[in-house]
Amino acid sequence: MIKSQFATLIRVLIDFQKFWVFLSIFCTFLVVFKFDNLMFQKVRRVFQQNRKNSESIQPKLSTVSGSNSGEGMDKRNTGFSNLQQLGGAIFIDDAEDEPPRVKSSEDSRPAPHWLDSPRDSTTLPDIIASTYSDFIDEAEYATKQMLAILETLNPIEEYIELFESSFKAIEVRLPFDVILNDEKKPDWDAIRRKLIMGSLTVNTTSEKPGITTNQMTAIFDAIPFLFDAVACNPELYEYQNTLSMIVMIAMTGNSMIRRQSINAVQALMERNMLDQDFMRDGVVPGLFNIYQSGVGAFQSNDLRMECVQALCQVISYDAIHDRRWLFDNFLPRFSQMLKDPTMHVRKSALHIFGNLGNMFGQKFTEVFLVPHLITLSCDMTWAVRKVACEIFVKVAECASNQVRIDILSPNFVRLLNDPNKWVSFIAYQQLGPFISLFANPDITGLELRNGQVVVRDPVVLEPSVTEQEDPSNSTFSEDTSDDFRTLPKDTWLPEVDFNDDFEYQLGSIDNTQNQKELTTVTTALVKTPKRGERVMDSVLSGINKMFGSLERSSPKSKEVEKIAATFSSPSKRSPLSLHSAVSLIDKFSKRSNPNNPQRFPVFDSANSDSTLSSNSSNNNSSEQQNSTGIAAKCSSTDDLTKLGLEDDDSPDAAEDSDDFTSETRTTSPRGRRIATNAWSKLDIRQKIFLRRLGALPPSFPKKKATHSSSSSPRKSPTRSPLLSSRKKGLLFDFAAPIEIKSSSSDHSETIPVRTANQQQEKADDDKLNTDERQQYMENSGPKFNTDEDSTNDSDSDDEDNDFEKSFVADEDDGEQDDSPLSIEIKSSSSSDFESVSAATPTSQEPVSNEFSLTYWSSNYAISSIEDELKPFGSSSSFTNSPTSNSYLESRFDVMKVNLSPRARSVSFGTNGSPISTSPRRKANSTSEPSPPNTGNLKSDDSIVMLNTEEKEKLGILDFDEMNMSISSNSSIHGEAAMTEDSDISLTSIEQAALQHVPVDLVESYMRVMGPIGGSGSGGGGNGSSTTIATGDPSLCAETYRHCAHNFPAVCYTLGRAAWPRLKLVFRKLAMDEQARVRQSISHSIHEIANMLGQEITDEDLLPVFYDLRNDQNPDVRNGILIHLYDFVKFLSPEKRDEMILSLPQFFPIGAQPGNQAQNGDWRSRFELISQLSKLCSLYSIQDVNFHMSGIALTLADDRVAEVRREAVMLVSTIVGALVTAEWDNIKGVRDIENGHVDVKKKSNKTDFLSEQFVDDIVSSFAKTQKWTRRQTFCFICAQILRDKQCDGIQFRYFFATPLQQLAQDKVPNVRLASCEALSVWRKTLIAARAQERRGQSPISSPASEPSAIRRDINLVSDMMVKLSNDSDIDAAFIAKKCQGLTDDHQPVDVASRTTRMREREEQFFGDIILSYSPGCNARVSGKEIKQLIRHDQGAVQKAAPLQSMEDFGDEILAHAADSVNIQTPPEVVATVQRVSITNEQFEDNTEAVDMEIEEDEDENSTEKKENTEKTAEEESENVKNTEDELDIPMDPAPTLPPPVTSKNQSSSPITASSSDNNETSA
């Protein structure tokens, strides 16, 4: 009971819920309906109000001007009431166009009568009249129809009146009062000026009508056609101003009209239809007005963008030819676009930088374009930076080479490392073209002439030779470039003072070029700076900056430690060059205060040679003037020339060599003496650091005076003499070469005599150095662990003395250049000093200054040659002490004092003696080698050396070391290890021959590929390939393709000197997994071979050539095949012989005869034949005959006609080469008299290659059953004569006999080809006869001609006469044409051909049996019926029904073997049996066959057939008629085999037919 009540309650609640849901839905519907109704009424009221406003604004037409105005008004008033009746049948040209609508039923107007008329020239006057209508919709529709009809009128000259009426109808609606001139014509110039100035009032409320928006839209759709019609017809020239005014008025309209006007202007500029005056006075000012009115206003950015694009097209389309007007009026406003906040505006403006540079020259490019390009390449929007990359090369082409190096090159490298993948991708695409701009033929020896690379000897630059002019700037005259050097007023540049700075920089560049003209240093005399010195210059600058910040505030030391940890940590370190590490230090120093007084003070080195009193007197002034830090004075990390260090030479020598040292010095601290005033300003930490670098302490004035007459030390060449722009006071200089003497019998001679002053100075310096180091260790005590083992304590004192001597022992030798270096070492067992030497007693070699890596002074060396150094940052002393201040201090754990047998003192910090605590020492502590013998040390042993692995990771290997590293890798891992895992570094690229190209650009290019395996795995690689297109393998792949495409340009720019580095990139590109990359290399390998020469081509390019030849991709193989000759000609003779042996490997697979599988590779066979024709000139006739003749004859029988035709040319070339080489011997051996023989006399057994080759041709082509081969032989003969490979006598000897036989061939195509060959032979003989006559007297007679030529001409003429009567009409026509008996312009007479075809038909169908009527046959001969053959119908059995065929299928197959014959159904009565009554012989006329035929029958096949027919006729006469005669089966149907009753039923069909014959005749 309770459950039922609960269920009832639930049911009621559910019904109640449904009711409320329904009610809510109903209420919602009412609300929405009411709202929609209100909105609809509101929208309708707004629409009606707008309609009324638009109608009130439209002007009324009061008077109509023109000849057709009266007619127009009359025609407009015709009945418009038929509009309701027309309904949907109204004529509409365009689906979007609608005819004028009726406002309401009460306000109906008459419809124009042309509304349902065709749109042609007959109704055009009525339509023009309707354009004057007061009704806006009618006028708009009429305007559209009028313009549509005008475009269909052709030619325009016949409809000039209609065009004039149309232009007047448009002109009358111009919304302003026309200003008339004295001749009562519109003064358009005055109207244009007032319209531009805004003083011309546009009427919108007057009675004069105006052009509506729809009319303007229709006009702009047809504006190109209207301008073209006006320009092509002089009668319409006066209306060009009308159209121009419409364009200008549209620029002042609403946004939609403006957009259409801009589009129309772009179309007209593209077609060059706008007048120059109109462009200057109307279009350009109007476009700038639209652009500037939208800045900061409520205007669509799309409209502004279209306006900017139109302005850029003014430059790109060269629409204005006045350069000065553009420079003064266009450029200032254009510069405002470059700082527009809209990204798209800046992008569009960037695109025309290249056009502006070509237009205004080099000076303008450097003053205006380069600053803007650099600024926009740093834009916050990546799309703008991407466009900057795209036009970077175009701008660089217009700039000077110095601007490219100093300004553009660093910024381009920054774009290569852009964080956005698209920017980096585009930059790497442009990297190759940008590098190619630095090409210098005088250095590389490669020059472009007419698009071809020409190799010439490099020219050493003479002192008077200035910097080479850029080829891209050759179009700029000097006067034109100077005209646009000064920017016009109101031109915006990125910074206020940037222009002055940039002009100053350009001035300094000009001064540099002037200095280069006067310098006496040539490229050949410039030496490569030492790599260790360059590294130390950069590291010293970075340490200098860190010291300044470290002294200023202690928290900055953590950042120094962080940078140092980044350099040393193996997990964070990447195998980049040391320059990248120094860049990080430079970034750190940029954040510090540039005016820090705690940095290295700057002093003038000119005062370093003065006396002590002068130094002390000027000390205060120099401190005040040079209190700024070194970072503020140095422009880069390598520029330390502001730090004054003393030279150890006399003032006179310094003055004499001032000009030389300004160009050739380097900033290495080794061997340089620090100025006294500078030394006094250094703290103890900086002093210790400089002393460890090999710098000498300040000297006393007395010592200066003593050695004032000493010669100046050797100066080191500068790093880049081409980049030095001004003379600078240098920081460091090299000391003289050091010579170490051994303590032998001449001990007294090698030890220099030390004066008392020198010994006192020595002692003072030792004391000073000891105090300084002790103070330094005390100050840095908390940072270093001074606990030591007992073993280290015992040797600390002696080691400390040794370390002190390492800094001060060479002080005196720096002053005397020619004095030998004596190193005094105090032995542990004796107190005497001994002199040691690194040379043998018999030969004493001086120690050269040109070390491969000079981190330290020459007083340091590795303790053992076998003791290799660990990689950079792997030392435990540095890893365990992250608080270490520099990487250099961490490297002391592997160094020691030269020839010191014990460990160093505790002054090295954390781990005490570095020798005992070094990780390598601990590993080899049990078997530590003894110190090397001093007498066996070479000069290179006295320097600090790094192992090859460490130098690879630092990127400082030279060429020899890199080659050694490659060879070692190849010996372990093979060739793949060399090409995949070798690090491509370019530190050594800074040679004298490669200083014309910025190193960073080339290094970036070489690091694109990186390890092949690294790019795919995504980790482990460290080249630029891992940073470009991160996360997008497709972009990486595309970058590799561009790298391969630009490789020839880079190779051309760098020359042969850079090939040891480019070789690795080349191999990786050739082994790339992408077919397109390999394809680019295969298509350009011949150009690379041209640049590199024979030796490099043989060693490096030839293996790659073989690999690409066997590539699986056909496009790659095709690139190798196309340039086969171009590559082989750059090989040495030995390699050429190897190449010709591999020619069969180029033979395509589908070329073998009988291979029908691959017929699509015929283009490869075609290209192979053309290349072999060129290769004949590179080889001897024996090689050509042995290796190329077989390929030529094989491809001469190819299936493709193009291949055969090209093979014929190769055969002709080979024949010519062989005959030319052996003809003289053949004439003597074969006894050829008078240059002619009829039969070859080969009694002599001497074999000639030419005769053997010709015999092969004759036997393979002329005497064969295949007619295509015989035809090819005729082509070979004709080609030999065309190419003049043989003269008339030679051709008569080799080819005349088989050619005469083929002239009577049974195939018409062969006779036709032989006719062409005979024609060429005849022309050759006639030319030879004319030449003989010119050589004789003018009155020579035909009898005096050589008998051989005259007889050959007669022979050929007789053969041509026979061919002129040939049965084939084509062969006959060619023969007559060759004899001059017919003309090409005369029609061909086909009557004879028709007669011959009828004769052939009658001969073929002369006597056959045809079906005459149902049940009988007829024998027909021509048109006459010879005999009727009747058939007995009783003997014919009916065929089985079709539906029962399946039932008897098995029985048919079972009795197939026993069946004698199969009867035909009664409806099939056919006979195609040829019979012969008489003894007439009918041969198969093979002359009529115009296709390939089988010729396997014997010569007596025709006689056998005749005998068979005669035997059959004789047997048929003896056979009697039987009841069951059979028909001749034609297409027998399968039926049941009848029972065989007698032997007569199994008689042959011919017998049956013969019996019928007998019956009929009886």
Swiss-Prot record:
Biased composition (Pro residues): 1531-1540
GO annotations of cellular component type: cytoplasm
GO biological process annotation, one example: establishment of mitotic spindle orientation
Gene3D superfamilies given in the database record: Leucine-rich Repeat Variant
Alphabetized InterPro entries for the sequence: ARM-like, ARM-type_fold, HEAT_type_2, PP2A_Regulatory_Subunit_A
GO molecular function: protein domain specific binding; protein phosphatase activator activity; protein phosphatase regulator activity
Basic and acidic residues bias spans: 98-110, 761-775, 1501-1523
Residues in coiled coil: 1479-1528
Listed Polar residues bias regions: 838-847, 907-937, 1541-1562
Entry keyword annotation includes Calcium: no
Tree of life domain: Eukaryota
Keywords of the record: Coiled coil, Cytoplasm, Meiosis, Repeat
Phenotypic effect of disruption: Embryonic lethal in 10 percent of animals and slight increase in the number of males produced. In oocytes, slight increase in metaphase and anaphase meiotic spindle length, persistence of microtubules around chromatids during anaphase and delay in spindle assembly in meiosis II. However, localization of spindle pole marker aspm-1 and the shape of the meiotic spindle are normal. The second polar body has a larger size and in 16 percent of animals its extrusion fails resulting in aneuploidy. The size of the polar body is further increased in a mei-1 (or646) mutant background.
Subunit structure, as described in the record: Serine/threonine-protein phosphatase 4 (PP4) occurs in different assemblies of the catalytic and one or more regulatory subunits. The catalytic subunit is likely to be pph-4.1. Interacts (via C-terminus) with mel-26 (probably via MATH domain); the interaction targets ppfr-1 for ubiquitin-mediated proteolysis.
Record's function text: Probable regulatory subunit of serine/threonine-protein phosphatase PP4 which may play a role in meiosis and embryonic mitosis. Probably in association with catalytic subunit pph-4.1, regulates microtubule severing during oocyte meiosis II by dephosphorylating and likely activating mei-1, a component of the katanin microtubule severing complex.
Protein name as it appears in the record: Serine/threonine-protein phosphatase 4 regulatory subunit 1
Organism: Caenorhabditis elegans
